[in-house]
């Protein structure tokens, strides 16, 4: 209830400005080790039933912070203390870039959603590498890499490889982002003919698990082709899904006036869940599936786990849910695991579709 009141006040200011304020506050309150430890005792996932080892990495809890919130790895120490089981930083590109002009982030409160056209604004993979070298985190940190906007499509492979080379030794896993709608031509790289050389080259460059992040707007046949390619190349998994360009069924007035961008949150939940189930039926346990998109409650999280997700991610749910959101999700998952007779998280993964 308190956060709802605070959220109403925060929502009076422009979304990106509030993001800067809140992110600075989160870093400040977790900067000192004693305070960070105290927060972790209250919020961090400590129930052993939530822990799992996925693609060789130990995760204390399945819910992670999705890419986009901490683009440059400035909050590495914060996320474990705030209850997340891991965090994915980025998206970063080989070269620093400013992203698209502001305003570029909007709230859709009637839809519990966000619309963004950030355009991969970031300080570059080199700057993130330096920060990861200096920083400390109590949880796994994955990195999400994208294509520099000015890099032509025919040079995309080299662009992704540059980022992978810089970040390889510093990340717990690497996610290749070819699915943001906010970089011109990026989603064209999801076509298997274009995607194959990118994924193969990144995998050859890094010793860490490599995953690919896909869009919810792909056709079912395209999803199947990417899944088959990921298995063929020996990828660790797929992150499903990114934001949607669809405007179907939105309730917030004036959305058309906000312009282009990708929508996250509740409107993408149904399609993200559909894509997850399709992927799990296609690949089973051959790939790790990370589900992201419209997860708001423990019931949502549980549905994704039993539908095949080994790990989960959230961003918009965190914005609307507040600082206790990750803890509430993890506590709910633990309760459902025990209520359903599971002794480990991995036993529950895909149990509804097997």
UniProtKB/Swiss-Prot annotation:
| Compartment(s) where it occurs, according to its Swiss-Prot or TrEMBL record | Cell membrane
Q: Where does substrate bind?
A: 71, 116-120, 177, 182, 242-243
What pathway does the annotation place this protein in? Pyrimidine metabolism; UMP biosynthesis via de novo pathway; orotate from (S)-dihydroorotate (quinone route): step 1/1
Which key words tag this protein in UniProt?
A: Cell membrane, Flavoprotein, FMN, Membrane, Oxidoreductase, Pyrimidine biosynthesis
Give the Pfam families listed for this entry.
Answer: DHO_dh
Q: Which HAMAP family match?
A: DHO_dh_type2
| Family statement | Belongs to the dihydroorotate dehydrogenase family. Type 2 subfamily.
The protein in question is named: Dihydroorotate dehydrogenase (quinone)
């Amino acid at each position: 209830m308190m956060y709802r009141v605070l959220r109403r006040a925060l929502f009076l200011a422009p979304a990106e400005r509030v993001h800067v304020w809140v992110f600075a506050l989160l870093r400040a309150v977790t900067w000192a080790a004693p305070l960070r430890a105290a927060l972790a005792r209250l919020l961090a996932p400590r129930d052993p039933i939530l822990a799992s080892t996925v693609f060789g990495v130990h995760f204390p809890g399945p819910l992670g912070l999705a890419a986009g919130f901490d683009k440059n790895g400035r909050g590495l120490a914060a996320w474990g203390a705030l209850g997340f089981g891991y965090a994915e930083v980025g998206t970063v590109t080989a070269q620093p870039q400013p992203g698209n002009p502001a305003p570029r982030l909007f709230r859709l409160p009637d839809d519990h959603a966000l619309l963004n056209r950030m355009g991969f604004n970031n300080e570059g993979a080199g700057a993130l590498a330096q920060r990861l070298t200096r920083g400390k985190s109590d949880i796994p940190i994955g990195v999400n890499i994208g294509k520099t906007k000015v890099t032509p499509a025919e040079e995309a492979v080299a662009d992704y490889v540059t980022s992978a080379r810089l970040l390889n030794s510093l990340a717990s896993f690497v996610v290749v982002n070819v699915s943001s709608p906010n970089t011109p031509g990026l989603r064209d790289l999801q076509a298997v003919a274009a995607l194959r050389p990118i994924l193969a080259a990144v995998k050859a460059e890094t010793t860490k698990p490599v995953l690919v992040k896909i869009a919810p707007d792909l056709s079912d046949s395209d999803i199947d082709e990417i899944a088959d390619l990921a298995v063929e190349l020996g990828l660790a998994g797929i992150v499903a899904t990114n934001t949607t360009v669809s405007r179907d069924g939105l309730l917030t007035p004036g959305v058309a006036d906000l312009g282009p961008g990708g929508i996250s949150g509740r409107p993408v939940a149904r399609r993200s869940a559909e894509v997850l189930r399709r992927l799990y039926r296609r690949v089973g346990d051959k790939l790790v599936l990370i589900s992201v998109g419209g997860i708001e409650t423990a019931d949502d999280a549980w549905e994704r786990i039993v539908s095949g997700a080994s790990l989960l991610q959230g961003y918009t749910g965190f914005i609307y849910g507040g600082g206790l959101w990750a803890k509430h999700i993890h506590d709910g998952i633990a309760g459902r695991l025990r209520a359903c007779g599971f002794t480990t998280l991995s036993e529950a993964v895909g149990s509804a579709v097997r």
